[in-house]
């Protein structure tokens, strides 16, 4: 399979259209999630990061594979990365969603990451309301690893968004 390393805005919207067919809760995360919070694309993106209701893991994987995706990294139950010959990469992260809006995600050591309800929100991008990780959640999710240049870029935007929120 030829692997494309860039997800365009049109590709992102196609992936989100596919996610919408499930009727499940999901949130855009990662670099595209930051750009959606800002309301415009600010850099190139290698993948689309999606956090989703873990109860749909098997159905989501079957659908992605039937649409031409191929699993490239399988770290279940933490994350699964898939590649599509035209739409590039999608990195899916199963979340256990609690009734109070909080959630948790398995970690690689057999434990859990716990997430507050206000980490989950939405933003308008290209005239469309997209469920995404909030700026507060993005700030937390951008911890615990060494930053690449794209992460530093995203953090500057997250800090800008958080400072704009605090001045409101």
Where do the PLM segments sit?
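A short alpha/beta connector and helix-capping loop motif
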Residues: 61-69
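Catalytic cores of NTP-dependent nucleotidyl/adenyl transfer enzymes across multiple folds
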Residues: 105-168
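Active-site nucleotide-donor binding segment shared across nucleotidyl transfer reactions
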Residues: 16-48, 53, 59, 134
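Short, solvent-exposed loop/turn segments at secondary-structure junctions
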Residues: 33-34, 97-98, 137-139
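Helical scaffold of the NTase/Pol beta-like nucleotidyltransferase catalytic core
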Residues: 1-28, 156, 160-168
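Anion (oxyanion) recognition and catalysis
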Residues: 20, 65, 124
């Amino acid at each position: 399979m030829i692997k494309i390393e860039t997800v365009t805005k049109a590709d992102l919207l196609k992936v989100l259209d596919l996610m919408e067919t499930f009727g499940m809760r999901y949130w855009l995360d990662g670099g595209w999630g930051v750009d959606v919070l800002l309301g415009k694309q600010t850099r190139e993106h290698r993948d689309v990061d999606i956090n989703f209701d873990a109860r749909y893991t098997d159905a989501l994987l079957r659908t992605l594979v039937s649409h031409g995706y191929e699993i490239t990294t399988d770290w279940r139950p933490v994350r699964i990365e898939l590649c599509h010959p035209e739409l590039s990469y999608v990195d899916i992260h199963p979340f256990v969603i609690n009734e109070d809006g909080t959630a948790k995600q398995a970690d690689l050591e057999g434990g859990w990451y716990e997430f507050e309800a206000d980490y989950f929100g939405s933003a308008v991008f290209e005239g469309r309301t997209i469920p995404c990780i909030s700026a507060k959640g993005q700030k937390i999710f951008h911890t615990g690893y060494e930053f690449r240049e794209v992460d530093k870029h995203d953090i500057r935007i997250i800090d800008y968004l958080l400072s704009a929120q605090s001045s409101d």
